[in-house]
Amino acid sequence: MASEPLALDIEKEPSGPLFLAIADAITRDIMRGRLKPGARLPGTRALARALGVHRNTVDAAYQELMTQGWLHAEPARGTFVAEDLPESMAEPVSVSVPREPATVRPHLAFSDGAPDPRLVPDKALARAFRRALLSPAFRGGADYGDARGTPVLRHALSSYLASDRGVVADPARLLITRGSQMALFLAARAAVKPGQAIAVEEPGYPLAWEAFRAAGASVRGIPVDAGGLSVAALEAAIESDPRIAAVYVTPHHQYPTTVTMGAARRLKLLDTVERHGITLIEDDYDHEYRFEGRPVLPLAARAPAGLPLIYVGSLSKLLSPGIRLGYAMAPEPLLTRMAAARAAIDRQGDAPLEAALADLIRDGDLGRHARKARRIYRARRDVLASALSAHLGGRIFFDRPAGGLALWLHCENVSADAWAERAGVAGLALLPGTHFALDRAAPQALRLGYAALDEGQIARAVDILARSLPD
């Protein structure tokens, strides 16, 4: 069956990531009846070419829609509109011959590493939020607040970063954002001029690339090895490409491979950035979740004075993706430029939420939650590692990560894309290496984000994974 031609109605300047705008446009076409159940969609390469976007962006949109149940993939055939669409879909106005309702398969997903929202300290958060809503500061406030965020949270974060990560953060140098994604966009707007480039890890984080492109920068991939970003390759890229004005790294638990950059390479990276006069954007991804040994200090904790370093973090990974709270620390004039860009797109943050989270930090509730979550996620990591070894030991290999909420699974003589397609048909959503590739050949690997699955769900997911292994 030929694929349906798609002329998607996508906003010219979407407020969020481009892949979500593409996913929303496809969803609208399904709900309007333009895309019928069972219709075949164009391949990711063809649709990317038609839309003028990177193939990874379309792949991310398809993966999102498969996770939500709008699409499904069939090995060697393609991607199709689901026959059993999500219950939220409105019934079409004109109905053809009635069919028997399709059986809805239980759906599981190895996410990209999202936390489990079931673990949110909801009672403590609700109490703190209620106090914030009833406080004189909120009820008596008749004007907008500071675009950099509420002073109470900036002071609380300053203490938290100093005690938990060894980062000396003056509250005046902190900017509160709606998640780390906004912080990355603002960092690029402040550090890079249109036409300049940001060096990024490859394989790496596609949503960061989207944020940088939206800010007017191009991205250039730098290979990642067992020690993280290759500083030698970065040096060569800077010397050959004068457009590179910044480098983006996730040194603590590299996304997606989970490797940790060692101390010697960190020092070499800081030296390279300083010598070439570029900006370092450090995304301290999953710092909270270190299971063996002490967490490695961030680059921001040992950077020489005056280095243009933008440090990005998030409280969303400690709580839930739906609680949008990120932050950035930067020197002047970078911070002023970031705050001005933030004010232009989002006048200020959520003052009651910021006050509530400041309460959780000061009262110790956030620290207690982090310790509890680490114990639970460590147990889930161990269950996943044991199940993978028992079911797939001869066909795959992996290093048990010392931290983070995902596992990087290397495939032995197996197509990761084909495996992901087969698993999707069986009811398990996977993220293959193509999702994280920029310019180079995609790694034959799968990123298994396990944190949002309990131990029973992990066992069922690994069973589907093993049964879906291509011959």
Task: Tell where the protein language model's regions lie, with residue ranges.
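Helix-loop "lid/cap" segments that line or gate small-molecule binding pockets
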Residues: L157, Y327, A355-D363
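Short glycine-rich anion-binding loops that position phosphate/pyrophosphate groups of nucleotides
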Residues: P115, P251-Y255, K317
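Active-site PLP attachment segment
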Residues: A76, R302-R337
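A generic "structured core" feature
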Residues: L207-E210, H276, L280, R290, ...
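N-terminal basic, amphipathic alpha-helical segments
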Residues: M1-L133, A137, A142, D146, ...
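Conserved core of the PLP fold type I
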Residues: R139-G277, E288-G306, I310, Y377
